[in-house]
Amino acid sequence: MKKKLGLLAMVVALMAITAGCSEVNQPITPKSTGIWNEYFVYPLSQLITYFANLFGSNYGLAIVVTTLIIRFALLPLMIKQTKSTKAMQALQPEMVKLKEKYSSKDQATQQKLQQEMMQLYQKNGVNPLAGCLPIFVQMPILFAFYHAIMRTSEISKHTFLWFDLGQADPYYILPVVAAITTFIQQKLAMAGTAGQNPQMAMMLWLMPIMILIFAINFPAALSLYWVVGNIFGIAQMYLIKGPEIKASKAGGSSK
């Protein structure tokens, strides 16, 4: 069920991206219409602008601060999602035994398997859907922030550190840092799950490569958002999964 929900989450994300692509080059203004623009993108654009004005038209610093605010706001959801994932992982040995017991693919056997799986969840107080809800809540917020960065026209007129916020980083520093921090964040997220999910192992390498390609071709403002978000995510993983990360490192060093 979780695999199906994960696939559904990916489909929803793809639909959101596809639907938003037609608007991503249109500046966000008070006159922008639609629920998406009025209640998601424009408020985040205004939040960036507010901090930029507060910091003397420093839009780079405004993106950093707004990213941190959003990440802190989403932190309780991430903690809940991680706890749910850990609870599901703890049940994996028993789940494997059930699947071996009911290995036949006929409908009656599969129904019996589903019934016993649900009983196992209830017995251990685990909700298989609890880990998916935070994903669906986070996706529109993070995607709206991406839109706010891309569609706030004032951002492209400013610089931050060594780069122009409206252009790709000419030295490729941000794209490389974004890719590396993506890899580290995912590596930490996988701590304690090695060998349990080959698809996650593949994504460990695929996601950083995708981020690198996107960051090379997108404005540096978006790369800055990725880097700050990833660094926060790394700290978040140490906060939530500290013991597992230490155990994973100890296991790796002993081999």
UniProtKB/Swiss-Prot annotation:
A lipid is attached at residue 21 (N-palmitoyl cysteine). The chain crosses the membrane at residues 59-79, 129-149, 160-180, 202-222, 223-243. Its main location: membrane. Residues 1-20 form the signal peptide. PROSITE patterns: PROKAR_LIPOPROTEIN (PS51257). Keywords: Cell membrane, Chaperone, Lipoprotein, Membrane, Palmitate, Protein transport, Signal, Transmembrane, Transmembrane helix, Transport. A lipid is attached at residue 21 (S-diacylglycerol cysteine). It holds the Pfam family 60KD_IMP. One of its GO terms (cellular component) is plasma membrane. It is a multi-pass membrane protein. Belongs to the OXA1/ALB3/YidC family. Type 2 subfamily. Required for the insertion and/or proper folding and/or complex formation of integral membrane proteins into the membrane. Involved in integration of membrane proteins that insert both dependently and independently of the Sec translocase complex, as well as at least some lipoproteins. This is Membrane protein insertase YidC 2. It comes from Bacillus anthracis.
